[in-house]
A protein has these predicted regions:
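Active-site-proximal specificity loops/subdomain of glycosyltransferases
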Residues: 57-100
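A glycosyltransferase accessory/donor-loop signature
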Residues: 1-12, 19, 178-327
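A short, conserved beta-to-alpha structural element at the edge of catalytic cores
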Residues: 135-154, 269-270
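Short loop->beta transition adjacent to catalytic acidic/histidine clusters or analogous donor-positioning motifs
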Residues: 31-40, 66
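Short internal beta-strands
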Residues: 37-45, 136-138
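GT-A fold catalytic core of metal-dependent nucleotide-sugar glycosyltransferases
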Residues: 72-75, 91-143, 159, 166-167
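Conserved nucleotide-sugar donor-binding
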Residues: 164-176
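Histidine-anchored nucleotide/phosphate-binding helix
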Residues: 17-32
Length: 327
C-alpha cells in the first residue's frame, strides 16, 4: 500500500523553522530513492519568509512536496479539551490532532521532531509490520524509572519517546482513536505532554522500534554502560548496550537530546554531533543565517572537568530530583 511513498509530519513555530529545515533537508538527501515524500508542516505563526524558504528548499527535490497545514483552529480545540500547554505553547500537541485530519493515501504517517538529523534510508519504516498496534516508537533515553511511578507505570514497563512516531493511520481512522483520545484527555492531565499520553493511553498498543530510528545523542555524550547503570534502565524496558552499539555508527535518525555543551545547531557548540547539523545547514536557505550562540554555563564546565563516572550519576540525580517535584 505504501509503495515507496513516505508521508511525514513536522511541526514548529518560526523560531525553529531553521532547525526543522536542517532535519527536512537531511531526510530528503538520504531518501532520494523513494518514489514520493510528502511533508505536512504544522507551523505555529510561521513567517512568510520562512514558508518561502522551506518551499524553495523542498522544491529542489524531484520526489518531494511540502504542504503547510492550516492549524489556526488547533489551539482552541486543545484548550477546549483541557490539555496542559508545554512551555507556554500548545504546538507539541498539534500532531496528535493532525493524525485524524490529514487526508493521506497510505496506511501510515511518520512524525519527526525538528531536533533530528536523518542519516539513513527510512525504507524500514515503510515496510514495518505494526502487528495490530496503533503506533511504533523507540524507548526514551532520558526518562528515569522514578517518573514511571508518577504516571502509573512499572519500572519494567517501557517508556517511549515521541520524537519519532510511526502512526498506523489506517487503524487510527478505523478505530476512531481521535475521539477516544480527546475524551481521555478531558479527564486526565499529563506533565510531559503528549509523550505521557502515549505511554499511558496507548500502553500495550505500541510496537517497539529499534534504537536506530530514534538514536539519542546522549549515547554520544555519555559513557553508555555507565549511563545505563546510573539511570537504572532494565533489560525488560530499555535497549541493551549491544543493541545501542549496533547502531552507534549507522543510525537512521539521530535525535538531539544531549545539550550540555550546546545544541548541535548553535554557534560555538562542542556537541559530539554538531558537525552533522553544520553539514546539513549548508544545504538550506539559512546557510548564512546567524544561529543562536551556545552558552558555556556551569553544567558545561562540570562536564568538561569531571570524569564520566561522576557526570552520569549527577545527571541521574538531577533528573530524578526534577521529576520528584511532579509527585
Amino acid at each position: 500500500m505504501n509503495k515507496g511513498i513516505l508521508n511525514v509530519i513536522y511541526q514548529s513555530d518560526d523560531n525553529y523553522a531553521v532547525v526543522s529545515a536542517i532535519s527536512i533537508v537531511s531526510l530528503l538527501e538520504n531518501n532520494k530513492h523513494l518514489k514520493q515524500i510528502n511533508i505536512f508542516y504544522l507551523g505555529h505563526q510561521l513567517k512568510k519568509d520562512s514558508i518561502n524558504k522551506l518551499n524553495k528548499m523542498v522544491g529542489n527535490y524531484k520526489n518531494a512536496a511540502i504542504t503547510f497545514v492550516d492549524v489556526s483552529s488547533y489551539p482552541d480545540e486543545l484548550k477546549e479539551i483541557g490539555v496542559k500547554a508545554w512551555k507556554g505553547l500548545y504546538i507539541t500537541w498539534y500532531k496528535m490532532l493532525a493524525f485524524a485530519k490529514l487526508d493521506i493515501k497510505t496506511d501510515r504517517i511518520l512524525y519527526i521532531n525538528p531536533h533530528t538529523v536523518i542519516s539513513g534510508a527510512l525504507d524500514g519504516l515503510l515496510e514495518l509490520d505494526f502487528e495490530g498496534n496503533v503506533m511504533a516508537l523507540s524507548y526514551d533515553a532520558t526518562m528515569v524509572n522514578a517518573y514511571k511511578d508518577v504516571i502509573g507505570l512499572k519500572p519494567t514497563d517501557g517508556y517511549f519517546n515521541c520524537g519519532v512516531m510511526l502512526i498506523n493511520h489506517k487503524k487510527w481512522m478505523k478505530d476512531k482513536i481521535d475521539a477516544k483520545m480527546r475524551e481521555h484527555l478531558r479527564h486526565n492531565r499529563y506533565e510531559v505532554a503528549d509523550q505521557d499520553l502515549c505511554n499511558v493511553f496507548f500502553k500495550g498498543k505500541i510496537k517497539k522500534v529499534g534504537v536506530e530510528y530514534n538514536f539519542s545523542t546522549v549515547f554520544y555524550g555519555y559513557d553508555i554502560k555507565k549511563y545505563i547503570k546510573a539511570n537504572g534502565f532494565l533489560p525488560e524496558s530499555f535497549y541493551s548496550y549491544d543493541e545501542i552499539m549496533e547502531s552507534y555508527y549507522t543510525p537512521k535518525i539521530i535525535h538531539s537530546q544531549f545539550g550540555v555543551n550546546g545544541r548541535p545547531w548553535q554557534q560555538g557548540n562542542d556537541n559530539p554531533v554538531g558537525f552533522l547539523w553544520r553539514k546539513y545547514l549548508k544545504l538550506t536557505p539559512w546557510k548564512n543565517a546567524k544561529m543562536p550562540v551556545a552558552k558555556k554555563d556551569i553544567n558545561w564546565r562540570l562536564y568538561d572537568l569531571l570524569p564520566q563516572s561522576i557526570i552520569v550519576n549527577l545527571y541521574a540525580w538531577a533528573v530524578n530530583r526534577k521529576f520528584a517535584k511532579t509527585k
